Structure formats: C-alpha cells, structure tokens
Design a protein with these regions (language model features):
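Oxyanion-binding and handling regions
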Residues: 1-22, 29-36, 86-198
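DPxDG-like acidic metal-binding loop motif
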Residues: 54-84
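Phosphate/pyrophosphate-binding loops at sites that engage ATP/ADP/AMP, CoA/4′-phosphopantetheine
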Residues: 38-54, 129-134
Length: 198
C-alpha cells in the first residue's frame, strides 16, 4: 500500500511517502508547502499521484490553522484521487516515535495538549502528572522543560527528532482509512479568533 502521510498541526509540518511500511521519502517543512512537498516525494519515488492508495493526515490537536490546512489538503487529495483517508492523532504519532514517552504539544496561551489515560486533553503545564524518569516529547515538552524536569521527567535534547510528529508514524498507525468526510479534527478548545469575539 502506497501511503502519503502528513501532519501540519505543529510548527514542524511533516510529510512522508511510505510503501508497505518502508519509508520512501520524508521531509520536515512548512504547512503551506505540504502539497508541493508531497508531489515531489511521489515523483522522486518514481510514482505519480494516481498510484497512492491512502492518505494519512494528522488531525491534531495543535494549531487550529495548521490542523485545518492538513485536513483540507487531505480531503482535496482524496477527492481528486478517489482514495481513503485515515485521521491520526498528532499526539499518538508523537508517542509512537518513542515507546513509553508522553507526548506534549504546545497549545499556546500557557496550555499544553497531552494524553491522559489515552485521551487527548488540554491543560496547564502544572496540571501534567509527571512520572519520575519518564520521557516527555514534543514542542510543549521543550517549552515547559523546567516545569517537567523539576518534577522528575526526562526530556530529550532540543534538537532531538523525538520532538517532531514525523509523518512516517502516521502511516504506520493508519490502517485502511475511510471516506474523507468522516475524518474529524481534534481541536480540544475554541480557536483564538472565536474566543476573542465571545
């Protein structure tokens, strides 16, 4: 199965082309270039977009705009190519990169997105239950390094690849997918613009 996977929910937009579990190519770039990057990866692998069997997309939580960009791109590709889409949690993809690690995404406004008992939650960094010697990954772990480390958590170095939700893990978690219109974003809170007008 030839899968194009991408995630634009965080500051590091990632994309990967995966054939039956083998990574044919991947990039970290900008959300605005995700379709162009995908086309280049497909062509560099000697394929054409019509060869794709599945689109795997990060559904958040993360940046409201980033999640929308990713979902719009996935839905557009699915419609044009008549392929299924699999929505993958950005947190699950981060956790898949480092077995046993706790994913922590910066939610801005002094909050984080993380998994609590397997469920995505938005909370203050101080509300994160930190376990002694457990690894914490993601841009939120980096931003709140002091809070996490002073309570016994372990955070890989700033440049570690573990802090990026690499799309190869979205492909690994994807399964068969389904109709694009059934893939829903995971926001966990209202967008900033909506909150400002409320």
């Amino acid at each position: 199965m030839l899968t194009l996977a991408f995630d634009t929910a965080t500051g590091a937009a990632t994309i990967a082309l995966v054939q039956d579990g083998n990574v044919l190519g991947e990039r970290v770039g900008r959300a605005s270039a995700i379709l162009a990057d995908g086309d280049e990866l497909v062509r560099a692998a000697g394929a054409v977009p019509g060869d794709l069997d599945l689109i795997a997309v990060g559904v958040g939580p993360g940046s409201f705009t980033g999640v929308r960009i990713g979902l719009a791109a996935a839905r557009g590709l699915a419609l044009a190519l008549d392929v299924p889409v699999a929505g993958i949690s950005t947190l699950d993809a981060l956790a898949a990169a480092a077995r046993g690690a706790v994913p922590v995404v910066d939610a801005r406004r002094g909050e984080i997105f993380t998994l609590v008992s397997g469920h995505a939650r938005c909370l203050a960094p101080e509300g994160l239950e930190v376990e002694q010697d457990r690894t914490y990954v993601g841009d939120g772990a980096l931003r709140y390094r002091g809070t996490i480390e002073e309570r016994g958590g372990v955070i890989p170095s700033d440049g570690s690849e573990l802090h990026i939700p690499h799309a190869r893990f979205h492909a690994r978690l994807a399964g068969e997918g389904g109709p694009a219109e059934l893939v829903e974003p995971v926001y966990l809170r209202a967008p900033d613009a909506e909150r400002a007008t409320a």
